[in-house]
Amino acid sequence: VFPQNFRDLTLVAGTIGDYAAMVVGKDSPVNSMADLVAAYQADPRGTAIGGGSVPGGLDHLVAAIVMKAAGENPADVKYIPYDAGGEAMAALLSGEIAALSTGFSEAIALADAGEVKIIGITAPERVASYADAPTMMEQGIDAEFVNWRGFFAAPGLPADKLAAYQDAIAKMYETEEWETVRAQNGWVNIYNNGDDFLSFLENQEQVIGDLMRELGFL
């Protein structure tokens, strides 16, 4: 997809996944993905979805993945980017956008503050840290996506140093401190290294590349 990519680096390990979420304002008449899709079908141009990334960025891609899985043409979905979370929230509350595409950890913070309702997340099942958030899958929308985090090193890293880094990361999962941070953010552990990490990245590259081509960005 890009001239430089993960193959130019030493792959250390994938660490966590942060699922994506679709949220609406706390007073919105939309209470589910079915409501959002119905509103979109009734008024496509008046039912915009916002996000904190540029067109073609992660929030846009998640909105496209979800709406495509709901049976809509992702290229037709009106996406409005915002530079800051405050701007996006103002747009959501004013009705400029009908929904906001964001990370699940950010959505949890907004929901806990009483500012939004989470109407769908891209996890395969509900996440214990915020079990009230329904998945897309349980609402009949076959959309699953995880925004992963991982570690990379410079090319040519000696094998013994690579193994030491991987061992340190693996041991991190066993600590209480890590579990506290993970649970607070709604993250899921997705530790993988070696060929498993490579296969994961290649699948992500294929899925995202295909969608970006469909949206006309590649």
Spans of features found by a protein language model:
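Conserved hydrophobic/amphipathic secondary-structure segments
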Residues: 1-149
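Short linear loop/turn motifs
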Residues: 77-82, 152, 195-200
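Small-residue transmembrane helix packing/gating motifs
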Residues: 143-155, 163-164
